[in-house]
């Protein structure tokens, strides 16, 4: 790869991240949590510039998270990019008991449904709502309101799902990591979470677990965004 950093060597699984911002942190935290849960040896590489040619060759979308890992025979380098893909890769490669990825086709399909819904709906909708609300130089009230309205529709779907008997999380255990960043505030701008009590409860429950607290900075030794290049 052109201009590949000399200190980057794929000896074990490498998770690529960027220094945390309001919109970049959560996607990389999710595979990190799953790696920790499964006890997978790994390194974290903090990318200085995602537009660099060497990184574009790894992920043409120029975003994190990205995983690189040697193939079992050591001949090839495997890669996964986008947060949903990295979660599925980790589960396929390391979750031999199906604890997080599902123990059969039915459970795996259920998990993948909710992961894909997040990727296609709530994730990008919330990202662009936040962008137009906070960062876009020109205020566009109709655009902001449309995105906010779409977010409430998607939260309604989550709340109904969690209202089903015995449904503590959206799918099998894996899916709890997709929801770990929800609802740290009851209201933000004109978007309030008071009506989504089950979503809030599930988010708070997950956010208090050690595997979630640690990557979010509760343990400074394992902060997701270290000053060094790798862990």
UniProtKB/Swiss-Prot annotation:
GO-annotated molecular function: glutathione transferase activity
PROSITE patterns from the UniProt entry: GST_NTER
Family matches, as SUPFAM superfamilies: GST C-terminal domain-like (SSF47616), Thioredoxin-like (SSF52833)
Domain GST N-terminal: 15-98
Keywords of the record: Allergen, Transferase
Enzyme class, spelled out: transferase
InterPro entries found in the cross-reference section: Glutathione-S-Trfase_C_sf, Glutathione_S-Trfase_N, Thioredoxin-like_sf
Pfam family, one: GST_N_2
Disulfide bonds: none
Its EC number(s): 2.5.1.18
Annotated catalysed reactions: RX + glutathione = an S-substituted glutathione + a halide anion + H(+)
Domain of life: Eukaryota
Purpose: Conjugation of reduced glutathione to a wide number of exogenous and endogenous hydrophobic electrophiles.
Family: Belongs to the GST superfamily.
Identification of the protein by name: Glutathione-S-transferase
Source species of the chain: Alternaria alternata (Alternaria rot fungus)
């Amino acid at each position: 790869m052109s201009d590949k950093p000399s200190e980057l060597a794929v000896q074990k699984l490498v998770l690529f991240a960027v220094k945390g911002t309001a919109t970049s942190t959560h996607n990389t935290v999710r595979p990190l949590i799953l790696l920790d849960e499964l006890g997978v040896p790994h390194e974290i590489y903090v990318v200085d510039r995602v537009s660099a040619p060497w990184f574009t060759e790894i992920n043409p979308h120029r975003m994190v998270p990205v995983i690189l890992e040697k193939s079992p025979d050591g001949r090839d380098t495997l890669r996964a990019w986008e947060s949903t893909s990295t979660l599925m890769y980790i589960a396929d490669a390391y979750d031999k008991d199906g604890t997080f990825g599902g123990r059969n086709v039915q459970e795996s399909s259920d998990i993948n449904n909710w992961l894909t819904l997040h990727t296609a709906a709530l994730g990008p909708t919330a990202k662009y709502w936040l962008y137009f609300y906070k960062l876009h130089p020109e205020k566009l009230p109709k655009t902001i309101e449309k995105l906010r309205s779409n977010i409430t529709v998607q939260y309604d779907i989550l709340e109904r799902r969690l209202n089903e008997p015995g449904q503590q999380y959206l799918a099998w255990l894996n899916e709890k990591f997709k929801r770990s960043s929800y609802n740290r505030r009851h209201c933000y701008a004109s978007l309030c979470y008071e009506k989504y009590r089950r979503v809030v409860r599930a988010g708070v429950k997950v956010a208090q677990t050690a595997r979630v607290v640690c990557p979010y900075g509760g343990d400074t030794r394992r902060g997701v965004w270290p000053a060094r290049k790798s862990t």
